UniProtKB/Swiss-Prot annotation:
Keywords: Antiport, Cell inner membrane, Cell membrane, Ion transport, Membrane, Sodium, Sodium transport, Transmembrane, Transmembrane helix, Transport. GO terms for cellular component: plasma membrane. It comes from Photobacterium profundum (strain SS9). Its main location: membrane. Belongs to the multi antimicrobial extrusion (MATE) (TC 2.A.66.1) family. This is Multidrug resistance protein NorM. It is found in: Cell inner membrane. The gene is norM. Multidrug efflux pump that functions as a Na(+)/drug antiporter. It is a multi-pass membrane protein. GO terms for molecular function: antiporter activity; xenobiotic transmembrane transporter activity. CDD domains: MATE_NorM_like (cd13131). The chain crosses the membrane at residues 11-31, 53-73, 93-113, 126-146, 159-179, 193-213, 242-262, 276-296, 315-335, 349-369, 391-411, 417-437. GO terms for biological process: sodium ion transport. The keyword Oxidoreductase does not apply.
Amino acid sequence: MHNYRRETRQLLTLAIPVLIASVAQTSMGFVDTVMAGGVSATDMAAVSVASSIWLPAILFGVGLLIALVPIVAQLNGSGKKDKIPFEVQHGFLLALIISVPIMAILYNAGMLIDYMDVEPILAEKTIGYLHAVVYAVPAFLLFQTLRSFAEGLSLTVPGMVIGFIGLMANIPLNWIFVYGKFGFPEMGGVGCGVATAIVYWLMFFSMLVYVLVNKRLKRAGLFDVWYKPQPKAVLRLFKLGFPVAASMFFEVSLFAVIALMISPLGSIIVASHQVAINFSSLVFMLPMSLGIALSIRVGHMLGEQDLVGAKIASHCGLIVGLIMSLMTAILTIIYREEIALLYTDNADVIVLAGQLLFLAAVYQCSDAIQVVAAGALRGYKDMRAIFIRTFIAYWMLGLPVGYILGMTDWIVEPMGPHGFWIGNIVGLSAAAIMLAMRLRWIQCQSDEFQIAMSLK
């Protein structure tokens, strides 16, 4: 008999290291924001605008490679471990291929910024950050390939350890480049980009060493045999990962486009938005980590053809995610001004950020449901459904509602950033409903249908 308590415990055992690793990685953004804000509100705003371009671009690549997690988990669960190195090596190849267009986009993003009506000094600092962080792209994606390999084998601790190494390195490197220590010039927000590039190369090499020395990972024989690159294998991995990448891109770019749209409203509003979005990203790590753990559990169980276990794991994930999000939403509402104070002492930024954090708290339950349900669907390899539903929710519902409320007087007087955050509530709630309904539909189908879907 399956036991809900046991399954919840196993999910949390997988999710907690993923959470710690994700919080460590996202905390790098927190550190960047705080240390850039220590120079000026303009530097903080530059990090915000640059992140609104850098994050969607790099997370598209990460989304492609996250598809390795259910692939490795199913091969592991079905006893076909000898096929894992072939898949992961083609993941490396895909990471290097996709790095090229991402780097080109980031390096030439100045053309996009030139079209934006932003202060000249803000534009200069934003472009400087992007030109520095472009060198992080291949390292980030190669690191993600190794992390997906380890997590597919239910080893989530390595990502946690390496994440903390990155965070611990990011703080002194920011101090050196942002404030100009040890003979380096004071670079302000641009220094955050330099530090980020160095940190991700450090994380990649640290993860590579871990894979080479860890006994369990060594048994997988990742580098025992080098397979001849097969374009069909790379294309298959791309096709499987593209819906995940696109859905991640649509969610992150929703917030990125908002940052770009409100950038002409001034540094105070942009900085307030950055505070709210950065803290929301930290909170989002809780359900996101649970979603990753759930994709591992569901993928492994489907590899064993344990359909009941996959269903129970999905239920446990959704329940735990909802409980956690209720708790974080309440705490965010109660302590929203204290949270803003962690980022800046600018009174105007604190007031506006507190208002946006209240709106962020409203959608935390919806955000948890949609990301956990998406994790379960990744375990079933139902990637296309995630892509379609998130596109509709974020771009056909959330962003139009946000723009209408924030920038026009069609319904009410322009609400500025508040209108966009109300649009976020609409978009994420729609995504939660559609993805949860899709998961329920799959689990109501025949055993043969579910197994066939997981093997495609």
